[in-house]
Amino acid sequence: MKEISCGRRTRVSFGKSREPLPIPDLVEIQKISYRRFLEEGLLEVLKKFSPIYSQATRSDLKKSDRGFALEFVSTRIGEPVVDPLECKAKGLTYSVPIYATARLTDMKSGEMKEEEVFLGYIPYMTDRGTFIINGAERVVVNQIVVSPGLYFSSEYIDREEYGGYFLPSRGAWLEVILDPYDGVLYAGLDGKKVNLFLFLKTIGYEKDEDILSLYPTYLDADDEDSLLLHVGSILLEDIYDGDRKIAEKWDILTKDLAERILMIDDINQIKIVHPIAQNTFEKMLELVSSSGEEGEEEEEKTKIYGLNEVTVVDAYLEIFRRLRPEELPRINAAKRYLHDLFFNPERYDLSEVGRYKVNERLRNAYIRYLIEVEGEDPEEARKKVYNETSLVLKPLDIVLASRILFDYFERRYVNDFEIDSYELKNLIRIFKEEYLEKRKTAPYDLRKLVSVFRRNYGVTSDLGVFAAIRYVSNINKELPSIPFDTKDHLGNKRVRTVGELVQREFERLFARAQKAIQERLTLINSLSKVSIQSLINIKSIISTVNQFFAMNQLSQFMDQVNPLSELTHKRRVSAVGPGGLRRESKVFEARNVHYSQYGRLCPIETPEGANIGFITSLAIYAKIDEYGFLMTPYRKVVNGKVTDEVVYLRANEEEEYKIIPATTPVDEEGNIIPERVVARMGEDIRLVPKEEVDFMDVSTKQPFSVSASLIPFLEHDDASRALMGSNMQRQAVPLLKTEAPLVGTGMEWEAAKNSGYVVLAEHDGIVKEVDAARVVVHRTDENGNLMYDDKGNPVVDEYRLLKFVRSNQDTMINQKPIVNEGDFVKKGDPIADGPATDMGELALGRNILVAFMPWEGYNYEDAILVSQELLEEDVFTSIHIEVYETQARETRLGPEEITADIPNVSKELLKNLDENGIIRVGAYVVSDYGVGSQAILVGKVTPKGEGDTTPEEKIIRSVFGERGRDVKDTSLRLPHGVEGRVIRVDVYDQNDIAELGAGVLKLVRVYVASRKTLDIGDKLAGRHGNKGVVSNILPKEDMPFLPDGTPVQMVLNPLGIPSRMNVGQILETHLGWLAKLTGKWFATPVFEGAKEDEILRPLYEERKKRGLHLGDDENNPNGKVVLRDGRTGEPFDNPVVVGYMYMLKLIHIAKEKIHARSTGPYSLIHQQPLGGKSHFGGQRLGEMEVWALEAYGAAHTLAEMLTIKSDDIKGRNEAYKAILKNMNIPEPGVPESFRVLIKELRGLALDVRLYDENGNEIDIDKY
C-alpha cells in the first residue's frame, strides 16, 4: 500500500500499478473545440464563401463596367461586456462581439478598400466549459456520428450482392455493387443501378481498352482447371512460345490456346481481364448496342468483339435514361446532372475527414493497382501512399473501390451464403470431369450456367453452382477471408464537438446571407461612397446561431445537481440529434457495447430508458484528434519491457496490435514477469508470449468514465448495478455538512478539481486574508520569498467565492475556504471547497454506520430504516434555493403596480413586505398561514375593467384619487408546500435590462432558501446501484446496537445483495469500518482494489482491540458482529454485517413530490381538473379505477366521480350551493366531456341526437 495526495487529504491506496500519465483536464474537449471555432473556424467559414462577386462580375466579367468583389481577410473576437454572474442574475446571454476585416475590390480598376466590420454578438464559453443563454447555464453535448468515407457493408449480403458506398458529408451516396448472379459490376447512382463501365466512360475512361486494363487477373499457366475454366477470357498481354508470338493482347483465350499454353514450360502465368470485368463489358454492349452476333454462340471466338462501340455520348444518355426516365435525354442535361451529383464542390463534399477515410480505405487497393495495372515494382509500390486531396470524388476512387469488391467476391462467397457441403462436392466433381470439357457459357454468367446445370445435371441450387466455380478457381490460392466494415466500430465513427456543431450551423446560415450580400454589391457605383458595414448585415445569422444554443437538441439545460453531474454532462456523447440516430430506432447493434469503445467510451455509464446505448460518456483518458476520431493512450512495450512512452491510438489503428491490461505484473524495471500473458487483439482475447506484446494500458481506470471510476470495488459489481450507481451519483444532493468517503477510489480529488467549483491556487503563496466571501494570497517566488511590485506593494491574488448561488436544479452552490491565514499554498492546491466537496475531494454523501439485517418488515422492497440521530446531527440535511418572479406590465386599462397596498388582505400576510410591497431579505416565509392564505412575496395590483361609474364613486375617486380605483390582487404568492428564508431579492426595470420584454415595466425575482431534512419517502442510495426509500425513522435508542453500545444509523435489507450481484457494497462496508477504527482514509482504485484478506484480517485485529470482535471468527474472519435489539437489549439470532457505507441522498425528495387538491383549475375544453403538481391538478380516475368501482357496485360514488367531481360544470356548482345550504346534493347533469364528444361527432358530419326514456329529444346545450 502507498500514500497518495488527494486535495488537502492523504489517502492510503491499494493500487499497485504505476500510472505514468496524469489524468488530463476533463473539460478540455469543450474548451479547446470552442476556442478553435472562435480563432480559426469562424474565419474558415468566411473564407469558404470569399470572395463574393457582384452578379454582374460573375456572369460577364469582361463586359462589366463595374464589377466588385468582397473578401474576408481576418476575424477578431472582442471582450465580454457583462460577467457570467450578472448574466445569470439578469437573464442575459454571456457573449462576445465578433469583428471581421473585409476587403472590397473594384475588379476593373484594381482599387481596394479595407474596413473592420461588426458581425454581432456570439455566445462565449465560461471558464467551466458552459454557456449562459438567457440567464440559464447550458452545455452543448458532443455528438457521435458515422464518419464520411468509404464502407463495404455486409448489408448487401441480404440482397445477395457485394457492395460498398461512398458516404459524403454533403451530397448523394455513390455505390459500387457486384452482383454475383449476373457477374456484373454496377454503380449505384441516386438509388438506381447502372452498368459501372458506362459510368466510368462518363468520368474520363473513354476507351474500352483503358477500362478493361484496370481489372487484370493472373492465371497459373500450369493449372489445367483454372485455364479451362477461363476459356473465353480476354488476354491483357502478348503470349510467346519462345520467340514466336502465339497470341496478341486483346485476343480471346480459346480452348486450343489453353491446351497449347499448358505444354509450354517457359510461361508461368498469363494476364487476362478479370471475368467479372469482361462480363460487365459484354453486358454494357448488350445494353447499348442494337446490333449483335446472334447465332454465333456455337463458334469459338478468337478476337474481342465490340471494342469502343459504346461512345461517351451513349453512356451519358443511357445513364440519364435510367436516372430520369420521365425526362427527354439530352447530352448537356445528362452531363450537368452527373457532374452536380458527385463532382460539383457546391453540391458534394466529402470533407477533410471523409477524404482521409477514403484514402485510408483505398491504401492497399492502390498498392495493388500500381503493381497490377501500372506495372510498378512491388517494393517501390509498397512505399507509396494514396494521397488524394480533392473533397469531391475522383475517377480513381471509384475504380479502386470496385477492385476491392473482387477481394470480397474471391474470398468470402462460401462463408457468406450457406451451401450444403455434399452438394458442393458433387458440383466440383461435375465441373472437373464434365463441365470444363464441354463449356459453352461466359465464365461468370450464372444465369446461363444454372440453366445448363439444371438441364444436363439436374442441379437446382444457384448458390451451389456459384460456390463450385469459386472453389475450383481458387482451389490452390488459400486466400484468407476479409471482414466487412461495420458502422458500430469506433474507427468508423467520429465526434462532432461543440465548435464543429456551431461552425456547421454558421456555415449553413452564411450560405443564405451570401445572396443578400451579392445583391447589395450590384448596387455599388463607387468605392468611395460605400461603407462595407452597410453591405454586411448578418445579424439574422448571429441571432439564428444564438437560437442554436437556445433550441437545438444538443444544446441542453445543464444538469447542475452536483459537481459530478455537471462534469459528466460536459463529457457526454450523444448518438441522437440532427444528423444522428433517432431515439425510436430499433437498431439494437447501435446500442451495444463494442470492443472498439475500450478506453474511448465508458461501457457502463448510459441512461436506463429509451436512450440506453445512444447516450454515453467519454472514458477518462480519451482524446479527440483533428478529424474527430476518439483516441486512447497506451504505454509502449519493447521486447517484453514496458516503457513510459505513451502513444495515442485510434480504434482502427489498434486492431493489429497486442495490448495487455494495466494489471499485468511487471518488475521495478518494467519487465513483464509472466512468460505468457493475456492480451487483446481486435475483438479477440489470446494468450501470447510477452515478447510479442506491443502495448499496455496506462491505467486500470482507462475504460471507464469519471462516474464509474468513483465506484470502489467496481470489479465486484454486476454491470447493470454499476450503471445505476454511476447514474445515481449524479443525482446526489449537495449536503449542508459534507464528508468525503472513507473508502474512495482516488478519483474524488480529480473529479472535484475538474468540476470548476473547487477554488485552486493559481500561484505559490502565503494566505494573507480569509473570510467567508474571499481568500487573499500573497504570491511567493520559486525560493519561497514574498513577491512585491515595482512600488513595493505586495503581489496578491484575490479569490472571490460564490455564496448561496442557485443551481439549475435549485440546489445550492456555495464555496467556503479550507485554508487559514498564514498557510502556504502551492500552485494547483485547493483553497476553497465548493458544493459537495470536502477538503478538495468530491463529497456527494455521508459515511453511515449500517447493518445488513431485517427489522420488523421495514426493509421490505429495499426500504431503509434510519435513526433519528441522522436528523439530529443534520447528516442528510440539504439547502435548496427556489426563485419566484413576477412582472409589472402595462395593460390596456393602465399599468400594473407593485405595492404593499393590497385590498382585502390581512396584516399578517403584509408584515414582511417593505414599503414597495416586496418581501424583505431575511424573512422566513411559509406557504400556509391559514386556510387558503399563502405568504405574499411581491404585492401587485392590476387595474380592473370598469363599467359606468356612479356619482358616489366619482366623489370617492376625487377625494381619494387612484386609491379609490377598483383593482385586482395579482400578488406573487409562495406555492403550496414551500417554506424557507428569503435570501435575495432582485428588482430590475428598463434601465437595468434593455431587453426586458414588450410592455414589461418592472421585474422582481425573489430567492427562497429552504432547509430539507431527511424524511420518510426520501430516496437514498449507495454507489453500487443499491437504492431504497426511507420507510421509518426510529429513535436512536431503539436501533440495534454494537457490543460497545453504539447504535447503528441505518438498517439495510440483506436480500438486496445476492440477486443483484453488487457485492462491492459489502467489501466497502468492511473497509469503511476499518477506516473509521484506524482513522485512515482509503483509496481502492477500480480493478486493483483491496482483496478480502487485506480487509478482514486487519479489521478483526482492530475490532479485537476495542472488544468489538464478538460474532467473528479469528481463524476465518467474516466481518460480522453480534447486534442487540435496542428495544429489548436481547441479541439477535445471528451475527450481522456492520460497517461504514457511503450513502447519498438523491434529489427525489418526498416533500417535493407530495401534493393534494380539493378544488383547483380546470381544463378549458373538457372542463376536467388539470393533472400534476405543477398545475395544482387532481388525481386521474382512469378506466381501471372505474372498473374497480363498478365491480364493487358503488354506483353513487362512481356517478359523482364521473360528473360533479370531474367535468359537470352545472352539477358541481349546484353541489357546492347544496353543501353551503346544508341541503341534499342534487342529481348530476351531463358531463362536459360528453358534450365535447357530441360536438366532435357533429364536426364529422354525423347527426347525433339525444332522447330520454319517453322518446323526447334532449337539447344538451340547455341541459
Curated annotation (Swiss-Prot):
GO terms for molecular function: DNA binding; DNA-directed RNA polymerase activity; ribonucleoside binding. Its EC number is 2.7.7.6. It catalyses: RNA(n) + a ribonucleoside 5'-triphosphate = RNA(n+1) + diphosphate. One of its GO terms (cellular component) is DNA-directed RNA polymerase complex. GO terms for biological process: DNA-templated transcription. It comes from the Bacteria. Keywords: DNA-directed RNA polymerase, Nucleotidyltransferase, Transcription, Transferase. InterPro entries: DNA-dir_RNA_pol_bsu_ext_1_sf, DNA-dir_RNA_pol_bsu_external_1, DNA-dir_RNA_pol_su2, DNA-dir_RNAP_su2_dom, DNA-dir_RNAP_su2_hyb_sf, RNA_pol_bsu_bac, RNA_pol_bsu_CS, RNA_pol_bsu_protrusion. The RNAP catalytic core consists of 2 alpha, 1 beta, 1 beta' and 1 omega subunit. When a sigma factor is associated with the core the holoenzyme is formed, which can initiate transcription. HAMAP family: RNApol_bact_RpoB. Belongs to the RNA polymerase beta chain family. DNA-dependent RNA polymerase catalyzes the transcription of DNA into RNA using the four ribonucleoside triphosphates as substrates. This is DNA-directed RNA polymerase subunit beta. It comes from Thermotoga sp. (strain RQ2).
